[in-house]
């Protein structure tokens, strides 16, 4: 099979580039085509750093664009290893600028800006120059009667536009490479380190505190309830949630700490209540205050009234949830 010439490879690749297809397969074919062209250029030794741009044949000026076209195509790739793609593009952009510099094809505004205002001014100037070059290139491409002089001017203009575009693209590529490297380093660091990030640790600690503030841990060393679910020892549940709930849905008063029977028994022990056994009832007295004639139920009712008078609502024990 006869191998294709450099001109044939170039034209086939240019047709693919100008086609409406933008899928990854087509892009790969375009890159492959330009890489074959570049390989042939090196083999044929078409260019030399010792010659001037005027010494290059008009028909061969287009091949100075190969590195630029490779960089431009790969820069637009979105799938696969993005860092590898932008590094590839950066390498070919810089190679293109180096070749153009060797042949004296330098940017129109070559001075370096000193301030931010100078940078903005330079960008505006380059943008306007590029617009003028593109208009000139468009006019040259429409001319049906193209001679060698016009063709040469066409390719030199296209090279100048590519130089300006490269100078605009390189800062963005360098910034993207820096961001991608940082992201890659952070990813490797997180994969290598078993430690969790600070935000995750704070979130888990907060959840643990919220859970432990109201849950009763049944796995403690000492048992709390017996087989009949009766408490073996006093315990208190301290809870921010319960405190809040009590303030919102609470009784509005503090609950008593003992029953009426317990209160009466305690008063009897203290001697504040006279037992019927110690003082038999008198048969000739119908006084309502004679305790000896009152049965146990009446006595409890009276002392319950006394208890309520002595302990108004809201004056009892403030500790709740005791078991």
UniProtKB/Swiss-Prot annotation:
Pfam families: TAP42 (PF04177). GO terms for cellular component: cytoplasm; cytosol; nucleus. GO terms for biological process: regulation of dephosphorylation; regulation of TORC1 signaling. GO terms for molecular function: protein phosphatase 2A binding. Transmembrane segments: none annotated. Residues 185-214, 271-294 are annotated as: Disordered. InterPro entries: TAP42/TAP46-like_sf, TAP46-like. PANTHER family: IMMUNOGLOBULIN-BINDING PROTEIN 1. Belongs to the IGBP1/TAP42 family. This is Uncharacterized protein C63.05. It comes from Schizosaccharomyces pombe (strain 972 / ATCC 24843) (Fission yeast).
